[in-house]
Amino acid sequence: MANDKNKNSNDYIEQILPTSNEEEMKRMMKELDREQSYREHKCCRQYITVFISVIFVIFQLYATLSGAITAQVLRATHLAFVQLLAFLLFPPTKNSPRNTLPWYDIVLGLIGAACWLYIVVNFDSLVRRSGNNTPLDVAVGIVGILVLFESCRRIVGLPIMIIAGSFIVFAFAGKYLPGFLHHRGYSLQRVVCHLFYNTEGIMGTPIGACSTFIFLFILFGALLEKTGIGHFFIDVCNALAGGASGGPAKVAVLSSALLGTVSGSSVSNTVGSGSFTIPMMKKLGYKGEFAGAVEAAASTGGQIMPPIMGAAAFLMAESLGLPYITIVKAAIVPAILYFTGIFITVHLEAKKLGLKGLPKEQLPRFMPLLLKKGYMILPLVVIIYFLCAGKTAVFAALMGIIACVLVGFGVSVSDLAHGRKPSFGGKDIVEIMCTAARNIISVAIACGMAGIIIGIVTLTGLGLRLGNGLVMLAHGKLLLTLVFTMVASIILGMGAPTTANYLITSTITAGAIISLGIEPLAAHMFAFYFGIIADVTPPVALAAIAGAAIAKAKPMKTAINATKLAIGAFIIPYMFVYNSKMLMINASALSVVMIIVTAILGMFGISVALEGYGFNNTGFFYNSRKGKTTIIAFDALERILFAVAGLLCVIPEAKTDIIGVSLLAALIAYQLILKKVRGAKATV
């Protein structure tokens, strides 16, 4: 009987999943995600790229385990591997053929690698003549920076490239700029040597993080991907929420929150999990624009989801000098509120459209699934345990990698014992190494560009200038400063992976908020939130565009829907700046609970206002024809009142909470009474 049920479950899931084969899925991912648009070499070229990738991973593991390589040499070697592989694997444009390797890409890859190996070979002499660089040093630096920009154009995209280029222009043109942007300007030699050879430039904190724990977490993610944890998470979420109203959308929210925290890229997560969840949502009855928006908003939210936050949590702990566990605790409540807001909106949309869930008898059962495949989450449990125990990110990642390998080989032993073909072996390890080496390329290049931005900030003092400028423009008013910081962070965050996003926004914009007496942790979280939300905010909205492409929907309409779904991310940061107890800073358990309850009520009110649907979708007015109620638009005044009640609830003041909760209760009571009078069926 159980076997029949599992068979029915599998048959039903196959019906609602996309019908495209694996090759079609790969093609879609290559079109939507720059990181997946790599060449697939054959024969000799394949062996060469595989060999370089494996050597790269072995070098990284050796450097991490031995600690015998100095920081600058490690970072330069890391960049040399990245630049070589970038041009061997990624074609010049999206439309370039992926089955050929032009001679000029080989040359560019070798030149890029040679520029960084120049530092490795001449490290001692470069240290001795620091500040007195030769013309050759300058020439190598110029070429290295230009090649880095070209690889950024190919793989990461134009937004971060344009931003970094603008900062370099700022360094040269300072004496021609007005107001707080004015500075004396710097020579070509000074700018190039500061960016290329200094640990405050390209080889600064971003690449330092990338060449150590970020690389290890990407390797860990590649191992998890090979074990099939993505499908496991989707199955678990289907078991938990698939049968609820609008089940597939809720599955998308839950699974993207779980997967997104590890991925480090909202676009990659949208493409990866969206290729399954978006067709499920459309099959159930959601419009394409809404289905793509749900996945984009949820995947973007995964980057602010503890415990890993796309590796930004470790960078934040290092930047602020705080324990990692403090960062995780601070991120918990905002993340809960963000996903609660999306969940409520998804539920209301399902009710408005009259969408049911997937038949429960045809969905996987939670406990049997957990007993059969629960071992897959063991590596994540290991990482979280060691991080919470106060171990370093590097140590925790290494333990997670070891746990992944042990689980993989354990499954293979079980396969052999039952006469099956082993599902994990030497070939899989090589594939995992190649995947990790390929996936680190975009992150490393983005971190290099972030290093350029941070390098110009440290050279010119732009961080202080911009902070003072924002405060001056806001006339010292906190609210206006927050608004200006929000806009600046969204612009700076466009197209940047999570780690680079945090480093750029926290370096440039967070200082303005801190200067007004706000907790540094709250200021950094504020800047980071809005940098991340750039992925669903028009006009760039890369995650929303990826979701729209999978859903075959209009990109701008999808981006607008994603922004509506992610409305919590535009409200929550203001809440924790004005009330740091939300970040569990000097907060009692009771105060945190009160904040969560009132904020969830507030998110409900705002979601009802945005959706135009609540306990009763006919608003103040309704029509009847032949004894049947005709559904008409939610009344504008009612929507405004729900929005006001919601905003009052999220404002962190006791008086506004009381007024907001009272108004919300009155509106809900009115809708319930109206529904009872009409004899309408319950909708929530």
Each model region followed by its residue ranges:
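Hydrophobic mid-bilayer segments of alpha-helices in multi-pass membrane transport proteins
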Residues: 49-54, 74-88, 104-113, 138-147, ...
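Hydrophobic transmembrane alpha-helices that form the pore/transport pathway of multi-pass ion
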Residues: 234-302, 308-315, 321, 498-530, ...
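Membrane-interfacial loop-to-helix junctions in multi-pass transporters
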Residues: 135-139, 200-213, 239-253, 284-290, ...
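Transmembrane alpha-helix interface/packing and boundary motifs in multi-pass membrane proteins
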Residues: 221-225, 256-265, 297-303, 454, ...
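Conserved, well-structured core domains of diverse proteins
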Residues: 1-128, 138-142
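Long, contiguous bundles of hydrophobic transmembrane helices that form the permeation core
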Residues: 2-44, 332-439, 542-645, 675-684
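Core transmembrane alpha-helical segments of multi-pass membrane transporters/permeases
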Residues: 150-151, 155, 165-180, 188-192, ...
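Membrane-water interface regions at transmembrane-helix termini and the short interhelical loops
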Residues: 63-67, 89-100, 125-126, 144-158, ...
